[in-house]
Every structure is written in structure tokens, then in C-alpha cells.
Regions:
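Positively charged, Gly/Ser-enriched RNA/tRNA-binding surfaces
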Residues: 3-14, 18, 33-174
């Protein structure tokens, strides 16, 4: 969730350069680097613990309870966790929650995301075949105000996954 990252950055008082460094560490899954960076920041224990959750991979929405209790004094972080809990409730209603995991450290190089950011994987694929997220302000660049959600299918990864799964698609031509 983009707001989780932004809320942490705001609460820690990170400048733009520090935020970029943290983004790069997270993008490279360098959680030791994140820990080292956080140790040098002189943060309170609660914020340190929240930063440590950037490397967590929760398989059930209930596992976000620890993050929620820690975030009680940080409204932006709490709002992000609440959004994820709501998503978890919808997933449960449709019986598909077992197919979704929550990763608090997922970020995007696209800074326009304001909400949930997602990646989709399939069997035999270590790379996402779909990526996307919510952006509330992107369309203002084009003179329109509207919340939106979008995604992209990564064709190369999708084709590789189909090949690994030995799924052949017949293309009809007229």
C-alpha cells in the first residue's frame, strides 16, 4: 500500500533523498539495508518496528493486527492497514483469500500510486504477470479529477508462464 510507505516516511521525517534510498532498498528486497538505514535514524521503538514490517509477507489479513496496533498514533499508516483489512474482508466473501498475500514493503517506481499496489503471479512464475494499483491524482495532470485503478499485463512473463505450464493457445487467423 503506497500510503503505508508514505505514512512511514512522513512519521520518520524522511527527506526526498532518504525516501528514494529507502525505495531502492525495498525494490531490491535489501531488508538488511533497510534495517541499517532505520538504525541510523534515531526513531522511537514503535516506528522502528513499523519499518521492520516492510519486509514482512503476510499470508492472511489477520496477520496485519500487529501492524494495526503499532500504527494507532500514525493516522496515514493506520488508514493503509485498514484499507488492506477491508480488502481482506471482500476476498473472504468471495472465498479467494487463500490466493492473496499482503506485502507491506511492495512499492512502485511510479510515484502516482496512492493506495493499494498489487502484483499477480501464477504457478511456475517468480516474476509478476500483472502489476497495478490505485491512483487518485494521476488524472489531474490531464485536467480531470477521478480516483482510478489500473494494471498492466506483462506479456513476456505471461508467455513464459504459459510455456512453463505447457499451455498452448491456438491463434486463429482468417
Amino acid at each position: 500500500h503506497a500510503q503505508f510507505f508514505r505514512g512511514l516516511a512522513e512519521a520518520a521525517g524522511l527527506d526526498e533523498e532518504q525516501q528514494q534510498e529507502l525505495r531502492e532498498l525495498l525494490a531490491n528486497k535489501n531488508y538488511f539495508g533497510v534495517e541499517e538505514m532505520v538504525e541510523g535514524m534515531h526513531l522511537n521503538d514503535t516506528l522502528k518496528k513499523l519499518f521492520s514490517l516492510l519486509g514482512s509477507f503476510e499470508t492472511q489479513v489477520e496477520e496485519l493486527a500487529e501492524a494495526k496496533s503499532l500504527a494507532s498514533d500514525y493516522p496515514n499508516i493506520l488508514s493503509a492497514i485498514t484499507d488492506l483489512e477491508k480488502l481482506g474482508s471482500f476476498l473472504r466473501l468471495y472465498g479467494i483469500e487463500k490466493y492473496v498475500s499482503f506485502e507491506l514493503g511492495i512499492i512502485s517506481n511510479y510515484h502516482y500510486y496512492t493506495g493499494i499496489i498489487f502484483s499477480g503471479y501464477t504457478f511456475g512464475s517468480g516474476e509478476p504477470i500483472v502489476k497495478g494499483g490505485r491512483y487518485d491524482k494521476l488524472l489531474t495532470y490531464y485536467g480531470k479529477t477521478s480516483a482510478s485503478i489500473g494494471f498492466a499485463i506483462v506479456i513476456d512473463q505471461l508467455m513464459a508462464a504459459l510455456s512453463r505450464q505447457k499451455i498452448n493457445i491456438t491463434i486463429e487467423t482468417n
